[in-house]
A protein has these predicted regions:
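Exposed low-complexity, polar/acidic, P/S/T/G-rich flexible segments that act as propeptides
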Residues: 185-234
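Extracellular beta-strand-rich recognition modules
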Residues: 92-100, 112, 116, 172-182, ...
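Short, solvent-exposed loop/turn segments at the edges of extracellular beta-sandwich modules
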Residues: 183-185, 323-329
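Bacterial Sec-dependent N-terminal signal peptides
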Residues: 1-4, 9-40, 341-343
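Residue-level signature of extracellular beta-strand-rich folds
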Residues: 56-59, 67, 320
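Extracellular carbohydrate recognition and processing domains
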Residues: 133-169
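C-terminal edge beta-strand
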Residues: 195-198, 329-341
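Residue-level recognition of secondary-structure-to-loop junctions
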Residues: 168, 305-312, 316
Length: 343
């Protein structure tokens, strides 16, 4: 009898492990919309007046629900898209603003130069001397005419705006670079703020796709890193290619690059002159960030409905993605609704 018990124990353990690999419940979700004064049905299409709260009611209890409104940037079918077909693009524009902070006109002279190239070979990123020689000696093209750059400190409200036609570069791999090189320390060496840098591609159907500077994968080349400057001593890691999130003079801060915002910190009057480059990876102008949805339910946040407001007239395909998952398995269902938004 004992022999049979011993044989059963490993069999039971195997069965229990097998159960853990399976989901306790498959994902299930149904979505309905109730008709109201400004919400009606036309066949299988929900018709709603622009600006009217539209409430989706749920049955089923999945662990997670993600909502794709169907608007530009939030289309389920483009959730994995990283490039836009060239034939679908009408125009491509790189835009951003620049303003200097601190210092004066004398310390702003030739402060920043912005470059572009379709032949730059790329940085090694682990051979600092070779990379620094490469960027200094390379035959860059001006992205912005130096005479158009700011000539004195200003403020965000008076930033200089630039828009560059990127349509000629569609399908090409481009590199963008910035060179920060103050020529005077008689006053503070200005902080340079670059705001909202992005490539916007406009499609034939009027929709747009946006690639922010965070996707350019900029790499700093901190040319003064081996000088052991007193106002850079707080930077103890990756001094050659690193950026910072705190105030370190003459070092790039890329923490806002996902929205196109980045800057290089200022230096006090009399401080050693700073010198730094910022170089992107090769950029495909028709690249785009994947569309994304809005998480509206998770295992700690329950909901039986969700309200959304469409602000622009048009037709949309709203998609709800319901998911149950554990570390071994996943179950997912989609529910789609055609939405027509009218004036």
């Amino acid at each position: 009898m004992k022999r049979y018990i011993y044989l059963l124990i490993p069999l039971l353990a195997f069965a229990l492990v097998g159960c853990e690999d399976e989901l306790e419940e498959k994902a299930a979700l149904d979505v309905t919309v109730s008709s109201t004064g400004n919400v009606t049905w036309e066949g299988n299409t929900v018709v709603v007046k622009k600006g009217t709260p539209l409430t989706f009611d749920f049955t089923g209890n999945p662990d997670f629900i993600t909502f794709f409104s169907g608007e530009s940037g939030h289309k389920f079918i483009y959730r994995k898209r990283d490039q836009v077909a060239l034939e679908d693009i009408v125009s491509s524009k790189l835009s951003f603003s620049v303003w200097y902070q601190y210092g004066n006109a004398a310390t702003s002279v030739n402060l920043l130069k912005l470059y572009l190239s379709e032949t730059f070979p790329g940085l090694a990123k682990n051979k600092f001397e070779a990379d620094s020689v490469l960027v200094e000696g390379f035959a860059w093209n001006d992205l912005i005419d130096p005479s158009k750059m700011p000539t004195a400190p200003s403020n965000a409200a008076n930033a200089t705006h630039f828009e560059v036609d990127f349509t000629p570069y569609l399908g090409k791999r481009m590199t963008i670079a910035a060179c920060y090189k103050p020529v005077s320390n008689a006053a503070a060496q200005p902080r340079v703020n670059i705001v909202g840098m992005k490539i916007v591609n406009t499609m034939k159907d009027g929709t747009t796709s946006t690639l922010f500077a965070g996707d350019f994968n900029f790499t700093p080349i901190n040319m003064m890193c081996h000088h052991r400057l007193n106002d850079q001593r707080s930077m103890t890691v990756n001094r050659e290619y690193g950026s910072v999130t705190s105030s370190t003079s003459g070092i790039w801060n890329l923490s806002g690059a996902t929205k196109g915002d980045f800057f290089i910190h200022s230096s006090n009057s009399g401080a050693k002159l700073k010198y730094s480059w910022l170089v992107s990876n090769m950029i495909l102008a028709n690249a785009c960030s994947p569309d994304y949805g809005q998480p509206i339910k998770n295992v700690t946040k329950g909901t039986s409905s969700y309200t959304y407001i469409y602000k622009t007239a048009g037709t949309y395909k709203a998609t709800f993605v319901a998911t149950n998952s554990n570390y071994k398995a996943e179950s997912q269902v989609l529910r789609e609704l055609n939405i027509k938004v009218v004036e």
